[in-house]
Swiss-Prot record:
One GO BP annotation of this record: mRNA processing
Keyword terms of this UniProt record: Chloroplast, mRNA processing, Plastid, RNA-binding, tRNA processing
Natural source organism: Syzygium samarangense
Function according to Swiss-Prot or TrEMBL: Usually encoded in the trnK tRNA gene intron. Probably assists in splicing its own and other chloroplast group II introns.
Annotated protein name in UniProt: Maturase K
Family classification: Belongs to the intron maturase 2 family. MatK subfamily.
InterPro entries: Domain_X, Maturase_MatK, Maturase_MatK_N
Subcellular location: Plastid, Chloroplast
Family matches, as Pfam families: Intron_maturas2 (PF01348), MatK_N (PF01824)
The keyword Protein biosynthesis appears for this protein: no
Signal peptide positions (record): none
Length: 505
């Protein structure tokens, strides 16, 4: 058992001491700034070195430990004017520092793992689009799918306990525990049945949440990988299979309640696939619904007995993949049956053979996307383009560039769509909204501006891939649109476009 318990240990031997002093290093906050946190109010007004010096951070930590930390003296307001504008400003500073510091052990482990596996382009693995080629390759051969909402209400102490396996610095853990208890309500946003991290402080809490989820996923992947030993029915390894069952049951007695071992006998199918995205996960299998039900109860029991997260099994639905659509990451994905009839001739007899092939399709859900465009004042709720109010000092080129940038970003993100009709409609809305905005600014009609801009204006709304492909295949581009009906996945997309992030709205 000691040999197999190593599978459940996430290489915790490389624990790092003395992370607490890093909070007082200026370059830590510079790293946080370079990682895309420049949207924060921390970096809008004052210089960076004035706000993240060791003296300022010491004062912030001292006041956080005080009984009333929101009281600032007049001298501090004069020396640091940004203190008076936002009461939670220093909590953002410390959370950004924490986010960079706690990522250090994980980053070192990731780099060593990639070097050991000789993975050169590791940045491609971070792309959101990298999940779709996997789905195209696997899901077309599967039958049943379950879309699971991962329990989100995690106790603060469990998040801290997760980091204790990685960090032995008691001062850092104590400060982190105090910080979470003090500012939890101001740093998260409850919404419906889940809890969303506020947009101002996502990095630290997303890291803590992901590290917590990886704890149960490590056990989940172990059981899935070890189930491959059960595929063979040869009598020569029958005793090995029995021995493996004994090891699984012993693991259940050590880590879980005794009732848990009765549902561990089902791991006979190696075609179970697991995908996690945002706060949800997908389970898909080639086997029967009975196997899916057993995996479902395994997950629920794992969450309840080991991670203390209550979850109701009835909330996990199991559906046939050919009759169900998955909405995630701005796409609607499904597996469709494409039938084709082939005539076969044998001597004087002819036969009609009906072939059915499964195909994984990804389309752009136009209704939610129009809703997002409507909230951004590009169109009304019915999808009719409207003019967008602009500043009086905005030039025509600035307005056009802004619309072109939005159009190309959406086209770039939705380039993997199997059907381009919805994408063409989005381009039409943005193009006509741009013309109406210019006409409104100059107090002229839309027709007048169309004549003034000419056909070159319409060509500017072509996406990057369309321009490149039209240069490579000019004849095909001019005669047929079939060239662009296939999905094109990009491995440089690391964040979801705000206009397509419907699930958080």
């Amino acid at each position: 058992m000691e040999e197999f318990q190593g599978y459940f240990e996430l290489d915790r031997s490389r624990q790092h001491d003395f992370l607490y002093p890093l909070l007082f290093r200026e370059y830590i906050y510079a790293l946080a700034h370079d990682h895309g946190l420049n949207r924060s109010i921390l970096f809008k007004n004052a210089g960076y070195d004035k706000k993240s010096s060791s003296i300022v951070v010491k004062r912030l930590i001292t006041r956080m430990y005080q009984q009333n930390p929101l009281i600032f003296s007049a001298n501090d307001s004069i020396q640091n004017p940004f203190f008076g504008h936002n009461k939670n400003l220093y909590s953002q500073i410390i959370s950004e520092g924490f986010a960079v510091i706690v990522e250090i052990p994980f980053s070192l482990r990731l780099v060593s793992s990639l070097e050991r596996k000789e993975i050169a382009k590791s940045h491609n693995l971070r792309s959101i689009h990298s999940i779709f080629p996997f789905l195209e390759d696997k899901f077309s051969h599967l039958d049943y799918v379950s879309d699971v909402l991962i329990p989100y209400h995690i106790h603060l102490e469990i998040l801290v306990q997760t980091l204790r396996y990685w960090v032995k610095d008691a001062s850092s853990l104590h400060l982190l525990r105090f910080f979470l208890h003090e500012y939890w309500n101001s740093l998260i946003t409850p919404k419906k049945h889940i809890t969303l991290f506020s947009k101002g402080n996502p990095r630290l809490f997303l890291f803590l949440y992901n590290s917590h989820i990886c704890e149960y996923e490590s056990i989940f992947l172990f059981l899935r990988n070890q189930s491959s030993h059960l595929r063979s029915t040869s009598s020569g390894i029958f005793f090995e299979r029995i021995y493996f069952y004994v090891k699984i049951e012993h693991f259940a007695k050590v880590f879980f309640d005794n009732d848990f071992q009765c549902i561990l006998w089902f791991f006979k199918d190696p075609f179970m696939h697991y995908v996690r995205y945002q706060g949800k996960s997908i389970l898909a299998s080639k086997d029967t619904p009975l196997l899916m039900n057993k995996w479902k109860y395994y997950l629920v029991t794992l969450w309840q007995y080991h991670f203390y997260a209550w979850f109701q099994p009835v909330r996990i639905d199991i559906n046939q993949l050919c009759k169900y659509s998955l909405d995630f990451l701005g796409y609607r994905s499904s597996v469709r049956l494409n039938s084709s009839v082939v005539r076969s001739q044998m001597l004087e007899n002819s036969f009609l053979i009906n072939n059915a092939m499964k195909k994984f399709e990804t389309i752009v859900p136009i209704i939610p996307l129009i809703g997002s465009l409507s909230k951004a004042n590009f169109c009304n709720t019915l999808g009719h383009p409207i003019s967008k109010p602009t500043r009086a000092d905005s030039s025509d080129s600035d307005i056009i560039d802004r619309f072109l940038r939005i159009c190309r970003n959406l086209s770039h993100y939705h380039s993997g769509s199997s059907k381009k009709k919805s994408l063409y409609r989005v381009k039409y809305i943005l193009r006509l909204s741009c013309v109406k905005t210019l006409a409104r600014k100059h107090k002229r009609t839309v027709r007048t501006f169309f004549k003034r801009l000419g056909s070159e204006f319409l060509e500017e709304f072509l996406t990057e891939e369309e321009v490149v492909l039209s240069l490579i295949f000019p004849r095909t581009y001019s005669t047929s649109r079939r060239l662009y009906r296939g999905p094109i996945w990009y491995l440089d997309i690391t964040s979801i476009n705000d206009l397509v992030n419907y699930e958080n709205e």
